Structures are given as structure tokens and as C-alpha cells.
């Protein structure tokens, strides 16, 4: 079913992103559509918290704070619980993904042609990947395709946009980075219409603050296997 003038709920998990979070919040709120921004501070220790308090007073977005670091999945689940929009998308607080591309991501959902849209970093322009991340992502995506009979190019993308009914149909349990493969597994097990579109991507290295590691890749594989055969 097509949507007219939808409200887009943007859930932004944040952990130690003081250098970039203000820019990303302002860029999200500058997108020319109706936006509900939900920011979840996962117990940052680098001064992100006071900055978020200041920005929240100025800009009026929804802000939650964890008393202890619980992981990206826990932060997302907290944010998802507060969603009131028609469509929801995940937005990381670093500068890797561009919220200016929300209108492209939302188009197929608004027209009623898709339930879920993934923004693929491999179909669009992107900064050169670290080889280990490139190979790891390709392997995990390949295994997801085999397990769920799909043809995704980028399972681990942050940009997973979906109708709110899709989100509400899933009981998400992962606390860490396993939330990404869990969402993918449950979306495909339920038979939703999924599209991919190209996005730009400016990936960062560990010296710039990247947090995901090879251990998270192993967790992703386990999550994909787990939810293929169990709910």
C-alpha cells in the first residue's frame, strides 16, 4: 500500500562519537521530509553525553541514555520501542553513511513496491574498503544468501529501511552487532519484499574510530545459522 507524506523514524545508536555526532544529527534533521529522530547514547565516556544533552535542548529530538554500555543491538531495541513513524531506518552516528540519501531509500516503500530497502555499499560509490572487512562482509552476505535463498549484495549495511509493521512483526533479541544479521534473518524468514539500492559510503579505519571486529563476524555467522532453524 502506498503512503502519503510518511513520518520517517530515524534511530541513531551512539557510543563515543563526540567528533561526529553533532554533524550527523544536524544532517538527519536537515533532510526535507518529516523526521522523528531517536538518539540512544550507549553510556559514552568521551564527552558525547553532555554534547547530546545540549543538542537535545536546542533541536528537540528524543534522547535516551543507557547507564552502562550494553551494545548496538540493545541501543537499537531501546530506540525501536519509541518509534511512532510509518517507516523506520537505522543511522549510525559516524560519517560513513549519508542521510541525504533517505529520499532515495524511501521511494520504493512509499510507492508500495517494497516492505524493506537495503542501501548497498557495493552497488554505489564508496571509499576503498579494508580488505579484511570487504572479505568478511562478502563471506557473511554469501552465507546469508545461501541460508535464506536470497541475492543480497550487502547484508551488513547500516541502512536497513522498513515499514514500521515489519519492525513490529519481529522480536529482536541481540545486544551487540548481531542485531544486523538478526534483522536480515527475520525479514527474509517472513517473506517480506526486499529491494537494494546503491548508496555512497565513506568507511573509516580503526584509527578513525571503527569498532566492529572479526569477532563480530563470527557472531554474525552464528546468528544467521541460529535464526535459520529457530525463531
Predicted regions: what they are:
Residues 7-9, 36, 182:
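Cell-envelope/extracellular polymer assembly enzymes that use nucleotide-activated donors
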Residues 17-30:
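Short, well-formed alpha-helical segments that are part of the catalytic scaffolds
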Residues 17-20, 44, 72, 98:
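Donor nucleotide-sugar binding loop of glycosyltransferases
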Residues 41-50, 95:
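A conserved acidic beta->alpha catalytic loop
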Residues 62, 68-82, 99-177, 202-221, ...:
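Acceptor/aglycone-binding surface of glycosyltransferases and processive sugar-polymer synthases
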Residues 66, 91-93:
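Catalytic metal- and UDP-sugar-binding loop of GT-A-like glycosyltransferases, i.e.
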Residues 88:
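Short aromatic/hydrophobic "clamp" motif used to bind/position activated sugar donors
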Residues 166-170, 176-193:
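A short, conserved alpha-helix in the catalytic core of glycosyltransferases
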Amino acid at each position: 500500500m502506498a503512503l502519503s507524506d510518511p513520518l520517517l523514524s530515524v534511530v541513531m545508536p551512539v557510543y563515543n562519537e563526540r567528533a561526529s555526532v553533532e554533524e550527523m544529527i544536524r544532517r538527519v534533521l536537515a533532510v526535507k521530509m518529516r523526521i522523528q529522530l531517536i538518539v540512544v547514547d550507549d553510556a559514552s565516556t568521551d564527552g558525547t553525553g553532555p554534547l547530546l544533552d545540549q543538542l537535545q535542548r536546542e533541536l528537540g529530538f528524543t534522547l535516551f541514555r543507557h547507564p552502562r554500555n550494553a551494545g548496538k543491538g540493545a541501543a537499537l531495541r531501546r530506540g525501536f520501542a519509541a518509534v511512532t513513524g510509518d517507516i523506520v531506518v537505522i543511522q549510525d552516528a559516524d560519517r560513513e553513511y549519508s542521510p541525504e540519501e533517505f529520499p532515495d531509500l524511501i521511494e520504493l516503500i512509499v510507492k508500495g513496491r517494497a516492505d524493506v530497502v537495503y542501501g548497498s555499499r557495493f552497488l554505489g560509490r564508496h571509499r576503498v574498503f579494508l580488505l579484511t572487512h570487504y572479505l568478511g562482509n562478502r563471506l557473511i552476505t554469501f552465507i546469508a544468501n545461501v541460508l535464506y535463498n536470497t541475492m543480497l549484495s550487502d547484508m551488513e549495511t547500516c541502512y536497513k529501511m522498513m515499514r514500521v509493521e515489519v519492525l513490529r512483526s519481529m522480536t529482536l533479541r541481540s545486544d551487540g552487532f548481531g542485531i544486523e544479521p538478526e534483522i536480515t534473518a527475520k525479514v527474509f524468514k517472513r517473506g517480506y519484499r526486499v529491494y537494494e539500492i546503491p548508496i555512497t559510503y565513506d568507511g573509516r579505519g580503526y584509527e578513525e574510530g571503527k569498532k566492529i571486529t572479526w569477532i563480530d563476524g563470527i557472531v554474525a555467522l552464528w546468528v544467521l545459522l541460529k535464526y535459520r532453524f529457530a525463531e
